[in-house]
Amino acid sequence: MSRFLRIRAGTAGAVVLLGFLLAERASAQQRIDAPRVDGHTTPLLVYSAENGPAGCAPLAVISHGAGGSENGYRYLAEAMARMGYTTIVMGHRESGLEALRADMRQYGLMAGVRALVADPTAEADRLLDVGAALRWDASQCKPPFRVLLGHSMGAETVMLEAGAKNIIGVTAPPAGQNRFDAYVALSPEGPGVVFPDDAWGGIHKPMLILTGTRDQSLKGGPEARQIPWHDLPGSKGQCQWMGVIDGATHMNFAGNGVGKERVEPIVTTTIKDFLNSWDNGACALPQPTRGISLQGK
C-alpha cells in the first residue's frame, strides 16, 4: 500500500472512530419534557451516570443562570456524570434567553438582568422545574443521594430550595422544600436584591459555595457573594464550605470567558472533594490547592 493510501486509510479510520465516540456521547444524553404541577413542562437534558456501581445512581440537578438553557454548563454536567451521578440540567423557560432579552429591551442591560433575577414568578417557576426534575428521576428509580447545583440565578434557586429567606415574595412552597441532601451554589447573590440580611441562618444541610475574586455581583462587588457562607450556621461535621478561586470571573463558572480553562477543573475538583468528604462522614477540607482558598464550618 502506498504512503498516500495508508494516510487515507488512517484518516478514514480516525473519522469512523470519532463518529463512534460522538454517537456514544450523544446516546448518553436524553432530552425530556417533564410535566410541572401547574400544567406546564420543563425541558431537561439528562446525562447518564458513568463508572458508578450497579443500581440506582445518585442524582445531580443543575440550575442555570438567567438567560441560560438546559444546553449550557456542559463542563459541569459531564464532570458530575463522570463522578457517577445521573445529571439533569434543567431548562428554565421563564428565565431563559427570551425572557432576559425582553427585560433588557425594557430596562437596559444590567437593570434587565436585575429585573429578571428578582422576578418572584420566574423564581417560583424555577422551583416548579426542580420538582419536575425530581419526579421524572423518581419515576426511573429511587436515588440514594440528591444534590442541587446552581449558578448565579441558579444559585438563588439553590438557596430558595434550601430554605433561605427572600424579600421578593416567593412563598413556601414552592420555596423552602429542602428536598436535597446537599447543595452547591456557584456565584450566589448576597443581600439586597433577592435576599435580606441574615437570610441563610436556617440552612443546616451540607452546602458548598464557590465564587471568585473577580466574580462581580449585582450589589456589593465580589465580596458580597461570600456573605451567604458567613451567615450559614455551620453543620454537623463542618459540611458547609466556601471556596474563593483566584481570578475567577462570574462567567467562568458558566464555562465561558477568558480563564475558564483554568477555573473549570478547580470547580469540578472542589465539588468532587466536597461530595466525597460528606459521603465519608467527616467533611474534612482537602489539602490546600493552588488557585483556591477553602474554609469550612
Q: Over which residues does each language-model region extend?
A:
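Glycine-rich His-Gly loop
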Residues: I62-A66, S152, P188, G212-T213
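Alpha/beta-hydrolase-fold serine-hydrolase catalytic core, especially in secreted/extracellular enzymes
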Residues: G247-T249, A254-K297
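Bacterial N-terminal signal peptides
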Residues: A12-L21
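The feature captures the conserved acid-bearing segment of alpha/beta-hydrolase catalytic domains
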Residues: T171-V244
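Boundary at the C-terminal end of the N-terminal hydrophobic targeting segment
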Residues: A26-A28
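Bacterial N-terminal signal peptides that target proteins for export
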Residues: S2-G13
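Serine-hydrolase catalytic machinery in alpha/beta-hydrolase-like enzymes
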Residues: A34-K142
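Primarily recognizes the serine-hydrolase "nucleophile elbow" in alpha/beta-hydrolase
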Residues: A133-G202
